[in-house]
A protein has these predicted regions:
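Terminal substrate-recognition subdomain of acyl/acetyltransferases
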Residues: 1-74, 179-246
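Acyl-donor binding region in acyl/amide transferases
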Residues: 18-25, 29-31, 117-118, 129-132, ...
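A short linear-motif detector with a strong N-terminal bias
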Residues: 19-21, 29, 56-58, 100-102, ...
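A conserved beta-strand-loop-helix scaffold within acyl/acetyltransferase catalytic domains
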Residues: 40, 68-154, 185, 245-246
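Generic alpha-helical secondary structure signal
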Residues: 61, 99, 164-167, 172, ...
Length: 246
């Protein structure tokens, strides 16, 4: 393992904070250990891995609970060895427009790195393709992107698709967790709804949904970096022996 820090900016006069993105390089034999310590592969800057408030689900809990009920009108199809993105381009454009994102974002970027290690979950409503989800399977399963047309918001397709992904990955019997990238701001509170929820607080995986939601709310309310919360996640009596030694 090699750790890289980018000391981009900070303040130490009237307040005290530093903005320091953290990246790392890992040997293949370290991949699983890296994921278990809050690192995920960087899709756009390989071979770097990045540290963040990652969210994941314990797949064993998905098998132990009653299967999520999905409306009969909704169907899913797993696509491996994807040959073309043409079927998803209109959905992608509509998704960017509805979300208010830069419409110049290219869908191709999601497949530039390790396309053979990714699958697409196609989502159909009454046999019409209306959404898709891109999942990286190796070295760990990561749900990278969900996009849909918002043709019927009441359907909550994103929730149903997430349950489908969890149940599908759990059924394979080869993975212990499913990752859904970092959880920041109000828009990511929904990630705490699912069984087996955990988030990385920088020291360990926590199942505290209330704390996670509070942190997301703080993210969205923050305007000035000087207003950063004084909350300290490390209690005075924290047992540092629990931290993994490399």
């Amino acid at each position: 393992m090699k750790i890289l820090f980018q000391h981009l900016c900070g303040r130490i006069t009237r307040t005290d904070w530093q903005y320091t993105p953290v990246y790392a390089l890992f040997e293949k034999s370290e991949f699983e250990k890296a994921a278990n310590n809050g690192w995920l592969p960087h899709e756009y800057d390989p071979p770097l891995w990045f540290q963040a408030r990652q969210v994941r689900y314990r797949l064993a809990e998905c098998l132990q609970r009653k299967k999520h009920k999905i409306p009969k009108r909704i169907d899913f199809q797993i696509i491996e060895n994807l040959k073309s993105l043409k079927a998803y381009e209109e959905i992608w454009k509509e998704y960017l427009k509805k979300k208010g994102f830069d419409e110049d974002q290219s869908l191709d970027r999601l497949f530039e790195l390790d396309p053979e290690k990714k699958i697409v979950v196609e989502v159909y409503d009454y046999d019409e393709l209306v959404a898709f989800s891109v999942i990286r399977l190796e070295p760990i399963p990561v749900s990278l992107q969900f996009a849909w047309t918002y043709h019927n918001p009441k359907l909550s397709l994103g929730i149903h698709c997430q349950y489908f992904e969890l149940e599908y990955l759990a059924s394979l019997g080869v993975y212990t967790h499913s990752y859904v990238c970092p959880g920041y701001e109000n828009t990511c509170i929904w990630k705490s709804r699912f069984p087996g929820f955990e988030f990385w607080n920088g020291m360990e995986w926590s199942s505290d949904r209330n704390l996670y939601e509070r942190l997301c709310l703080i993210d969205s309310s923050l305007v000035d970096p000087d207003d950063l919360s004084n909350d300290d996640l490390i209690p005075i009596n924290y047992d540092f022996s629990k931290i993994t030694s490399w």
